[in-house]
Amino acid sequence: MACCCYSTILTHTRLDFKTMHQNALNNATLNVLGHKKNGSSSIQELIEMDEEEAEMNQNVVCIGPNETAVSVELGDEYEKFNIITSLKKDNLFSKDGLLYAYYELCQEKFEKCLKEDDEEWIELWDLESRTWDLIQRLYSFRLSEQQGHIQSHAFSSRAVLEEEYYSQNPEAFENNIVFNWARDNSSDPPSIEIRGNRWFYTREDIKMKNRGGSRFSSNISGTIVSNLDPDADIRDDKRLDERDDNFERQFFHTAFCLFRSGSFEELLELCRRTGNHWRSASLQGILEYRDNLIDDVLQSETSGNKRKELLRRSCLALTKNKRIDSYERALYGALCGDLNSVLDVCTTWEDAMWAYYNSMTQYNLDVYLSSKAPQTETQLPPVDSGLGLTPELIFNSLSNSSIASIQEEASHPLIKLQTHIICNKISEILSSAHIQLEAIRTGNAPESGDLVTPPLLRILTHIILFLKISGLAVDEYTSDSIIQAYIELLASAKKVNLVPLYIQYLSNQVQYEAYSRFLILVDEESARSEQLQLAKKYSLDINHAALLAVEYVYDEVVSVSPEEVHTVYLKSIEEPVEPSYKKLICTLEWLLITSQTDELLRFANLVYRFFLSIGELNSAYDLYTHIPSDALNTLSSSDGEPENDSKFRDAYELMNYRALCRALKFYQEWEELSKQEVFEDSAVTKASTSYKVWKKKLNFASRKCVKSFTDLLQANWLHPSTLELKPDDDPLLYKTLMTIRNLYVPELILGLHNVYFSLEDYDSCFALANEVASEDLKLYHCLIKSGRLVEYVSYLGKAGECSLSTPNGLFSL
């Protein structure tokens, strides 16, 4: 399964918001900064006005960067791995430790899939459980303190020499660990019907043949053995009765599987129960000789075979006999360390890998024992099938096996992971996963995405965590890449509560960058509250991350400078907000949640400037609804020290933007009411209830518009001088404020004129014109700069024409 880009659908139900009160900025032209020390500033008045407005709700949906919604479903194992890691990270190798808990969880999943007969997941969980078992075994040795070496003497038994060999050779000890791991992870042996009487049918055939007939076999000839010696069939080159021959094949298949799985006692018991007592005795000859009288540190009795190498040579000779069953040859081959005879019956990667390791470990041990206890005259050379074998060569041979099933299994990502763990080259497979992730991130499909599927990302991430907890070196660039991909995966599946645990394992260079980009994806109120608690639990600086998140999204979205005024198209408040702007607003709320008031003021103003400069009135209004006025409450209690000047300036600028959004919302509501066709139904007259209700609403909307527009104009809305800002103080900011002012003051003038005109209040239209033309506020400059002076003059002309017909007009007589 190839890995996809983990973009997510971000659905967020916004908080209630408050709009500003109808009371306008009557006193806004007063120098706000100059009145702070009097204890009651215009800022406080603006906040109080804001809190009187009715509450409203709005649902917002944001989607991923490509405007696509991608959902990833993950099982409960992701939560369980998270919990296990959190609880057991200080206890790695014990029976109640981290790695064993991983292993047990995988075993539980494996058993469940067996019941559900889910073949794909049966294989995955089986391989994963084996992987954690392998890590537990290998790393408990690699990270353990080296104990004192076992020392032998001239008369030590071969069993002691074997222990000495492993105690002095860490590489050999690791190979033996892997061999035991492969042995313990074998498949269950096939079942077999137990017969207590060996060669029963052949025995009866021989009896009947000697008596001159047989009721058990209809075809007695000289091809059947004539006696029941254990090696009669081989020695005489004759066969058994077909039924006994079939049973022998089943027996050797089961016997080999029992030896393969390390069930040596069960193998001996099988021999005894099937009448193969001689075979049980001969198999015990494979045990190394141990003498408790010489090896006084050992408590066991004398046991084993002094001439084990002779038995193994006999076994090797039997592997060359093609007349005997392949599983019998494989059993003898496994006993002596021969490779080819065992490989002949191996059809799985695990079995073939065990065969290689069996041959390699036996050969290396034999070479050591021969060097420690040479018997020049009688010593037989070791079986050399394992000569030159190393783990790397073994896995390379398996990858290029002539058996298709073995070669296919060798390419499985979890088996590749196991081979890298065994060869202590975990960094290489982590690097391969990183390369695949980079290909996906850059839009190039990797040749293989097998290492970055959700299950593999989970496994690799927790291996990285284990390595870091263990104090082992991990390439930071590679590990960061994989952990970040896993974080993206969890976020895609809405498992955001799991993410903070993994954030803390990122390197210092990217930790808060990743944390901040993750916070961008967390948009639900409950999830954000939970993130605050998790940040405290894992000692993460969520304030810093939230600020970085806002900076990232702002830099991403605000990529162009404001256009010239005459090229700007003002969007309606009701138009849908672009997803990228939604994301910016949603991210800005993190500063509110983390109570970073100063930064909230700064960035809210930056975002307002951007939106209003490019005509995104709908986006500006959306921002207005998501940053409530009570976010500024801390300002009302601030002292009047000079260092707070910039804070009050930011707050006053923000209140200007909020007042504009509120006023234009009033105007939009007024327009909707004024366009309603209340007289379409002839039954609706001026005396009707419907008309009266509509008229009342319209008059109220008109009053709100007049009040709010008038207050904004009289307050010299957003003029830099009201912020005590001069052109030389900050030329770019000064220019930006003037650009926005020149864009929206004409909207206020024309909108207010329209309301007066609809009310047939022509005197107010002309009074407004006088204010516009006044040199006090120089509002006419905004009309000139915006190129809308001619438009306004034409409106006045219409008002003049209509005023002539009024009772007080020129032609009223």
Curated annotation (Swiss-Prot):
It is found in: Cytoplasm; Nucleus membrane; Nucleus, Nuclear pore complex. The keyword rRNA processing does not apply. Gene3D superfamilies: 1.10.3450.20, 1.20.190.50. One of its GO terms (biological process) is poly(A)+ mRNA export from nucleus. Signal peptide: none annotated. GO terms for cellular component: cytosol; mitotic nuclear bridge midzone membrane domain; nuclear membrane; nuclear periphery; nuclear pore; nuclear pore outer ring; nucleus. InterPro entries: Nup84/Nup107. It comes from the Eukaryota. Keywords: Cytoplasm, Membrane, mRNA transport, Nuclear pore complex, Nucleus, Protein transport, Translocation, Transport. GO terms for molecular function: structural constituent of nuclear pore. The keyword Membrane applies. Component of the npc107-120 complex which consists of nup85, nup107, nup120, nup131, nup132 and seh1. Interacts with nup120, nup131 and nup132. Functions as a component of the nuclear pore complex (NPC). NPC components, collectively referred to as nucleoporins (NUPs), can play the role of both NPC structural components and of docking or interaction partners for transiently associated nuclear transport factors. Active directional transport is assured by both, a Phe-Gly (FG) repeat affinity gradient for these transport factors across the NPC and a transport cofactor concentration gradient across the nuclear envelope. Belongs to the nucleoporin Nup84/Nup107 family. This is Nucleoporin nup107. It comes from Schizosaccharomyces pombe (strain 972 / ATCC 24843). The gene is nup107.
